[in-house]
Amino acid sequence: MTIVAARRHVEVPRQVRVLAAARAVNQLGAFSLAFLTVMMCRVLGASMATAGAVSALFGLATIPSRLFGGRLADRLGQRRTILAGLTGCAAAQLGIAAAPNLAVAAVCAALLGLAFELYEPPSQAMIADATEPSQRTHAYALLTTALAVGNMGAGLIANAVGHSGLRWLFVVDAASCLACALIVRLALPSGDRRPASQLQPPSPDGGLRVRLVVSPWRDPRLLAMTAAGTIFALVYMLILVALPLSLSARGLNPASAGLVMAAATLTLVVTRPVLRIPLVAGLSGQVACGTGFALMAAGLAGYATAHSLSGLLAPTAVWSAGNLLLSGRAFAVVAALAPPGAAARYLAVYGLSWGIATVAAPVLATQVIGSLGPAALWSGCAVLCAAMSCVQPALMRGVMRRSQVPVASAS
């Protein structure tokens, strides 16, 4: 594996910029999921354990959704799969917003999970197909930053709309999905030609070449990256899901979680130019990941001791800076590990880390906060990140020894 430090601005194709902008629009309403558990408790009268179970059901449904997304991208094309996922999400979110009881909300949550991850593998594969290996870390970091900017707007929207009723958050989310679908439909190429995984280039002697199909499940490098990615995804999902519950447990307005996440995004955007400083741009992947997880550990440890909204701001800036250093690196490595034409399937398997985390996070958040309190949850998250600050660099070195994967810094 070769780590190439990008010391100058890296241009990415227009297709990547358009996709990032469309996903940012989609993300404007995406904060509704952070309030799914709270809404079921406050609006539909569910217990915290029941609401956590329904949220876990949503997360469980995202696991096959991610795999279906990878397969559909190969068969239907990337753009069609993205559109199917976005419209499916919008329909399910409107169902949650209008649900008269817990049973209907649970069914709609499961349907939302089945549609929720359909568009991720084709989105990530579209970036891999449109960029050179040296551009990928920057391209995936651009997508991450665009989603973060959308999250900042989502946090402000959640803080404003949430005071009028939690159901309205899901209506806004549905509208953002449809707006994103419109941009994708009008501005991105169809991608509905025969995918690269089905093309058979001629052999050097002019004859037909037999295409070797490589199963992602048999690649130990991918499985190791997925295991590490699951830990990061779990911590991130716990922040998203547990923050409103933590605020509520400490007597604060759970809708204020939107302001906290907006502060996290502001930190991510404002500090991003730091990545272009030669000293930072020259960091190896191992050092950047180790430092990133260490900063996340410090920030989440600060959450354990914060008891006011203002007290959460400094820890939020710290863990968000750590997230910035991690941004885009794992996706670039996974995309580079994939054989030609297999990027969607590799990224779909790696993306299962988010499905697993989405299942586990609501259950852990409700159980730990309900029985031990918010401080125990945030302390546990800090310990996980501290451990990953050692594990992730070791994993990166292992992949380096076995592969030649160019990974540029996310400058």
Describe the residue ranges of each PLM region:
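C-terminal membrane-cytosol helix-exit motif in multi-pass small-molecule transporters
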Residues: 176-197, 391-396
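Juxtamembrane intracellular "pre-TM" segments in multi-pass secondary transporters
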Residues: 1-13, 189-227
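Structural signature of the two symmetry-related core transmembrane helices
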Residues: 80-94, 287-301
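Residue-level signature of mid-helix packing/kink "hotspots" within the transmembrane helices
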Residues: 31, 59-67, 151-152, 265-273, ...
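Helix-breaking motifs and short loop linkers at transmembrane-helix boundaries and internal kinks
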Residues: 45, 77, 98-103, 305-307
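Helix-loop boundary and gating motifs at the non-cytosolic
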Residues: 9-59, 221-261
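Cytoplasmic helix-loop-helix junction between adjacent transmembrane helices
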Residues: 108-147
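Helix-to-loop junctions at the C-terminal end of transmembrane segments
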Residues: 65-77, 271-284
